[in-house]
Amino acid sequence: VNEIIHKWYSNPAKALEEAKVKRKPVMLQFERDNCSGCRKLYSVTFKELEVEKEIFKYVIPLRVNILKEREIRRKYSAVWTPSFYFINYKGKLFYSFSGYLPPEDFRIILRLGVSSFLVPQGKYSEAIEILEEGIRLFPENPRRPELMLKLGMAKYLKTWDNKMFRREMDEIRRRFPDSAIARMWAWEDENYTP
């Protein structure tokens, strides 16, 4: 059987080295003993095959104990477990999230973290692809407006089409009027319709 065994890194230096070689972000996870969110993450979320596939497709996973790895904890001001930090091979932070996530939400946060790594590098098409996939896969998830906002930003930065970005924001306001993202409408004409 040619089964691929996926392994999380526990050594930050080795994970950063691998990230440099593979040109992927590191997804740093802080854990600790007696963390109920960590236990549920391992028994529910990380048991799902699609979650595991996507982790190893998109990131270099690194897991460290928040109480034992003081230097790295201090660098990111980490205080909670589980928590996730998407960083480049130099250790620069691009996105973070704290708390337990069920499988679908984790897959969305993974996409938000990876796209936050890709966009500053000008890899707009890659970011757009991963965000559009998330929107297709999780049409009813309450985190969808976050995906839509990041998608609108990536498209805008790729094309500099302001009207397109306003249409994306308007769709968020129409479909998810109570979301925090819908409240980010920045234009004076409150009743704008594309």
Locations of the language-model features?
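TPR/TPR-like alpha-solenoid helical repeat scaffolds
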Residues: 144-157, 180-194
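Short solvent-exposed coil/turn linkers within tandem alpha-helical repeat scaffolds
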Residues: 49, 96-100, 134-145, 172-186
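Short active-site neighborhood of thiol/selenol oxidoreductases, capturing the structured segment around
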Residues: 22-35
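Non-catalytic, surface beta->alpha helical segment in thiol-disulfide oxidoreductase systems
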Residues: 78-114, 118
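Alpha-helical segment of the N-proximal tetratricopeptide repeat
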Residues: 74, 110-140
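A short beta-strand-turn-helix
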Residues: 8-25
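Single-residue signature of alpha-solenoid repeat helices
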Residues: 127, 164-165
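Thiol-based oxidoreductase modules, predominantly thioredoxin-like and allied folds used
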Residues: 4-10, 30-32, 45-70
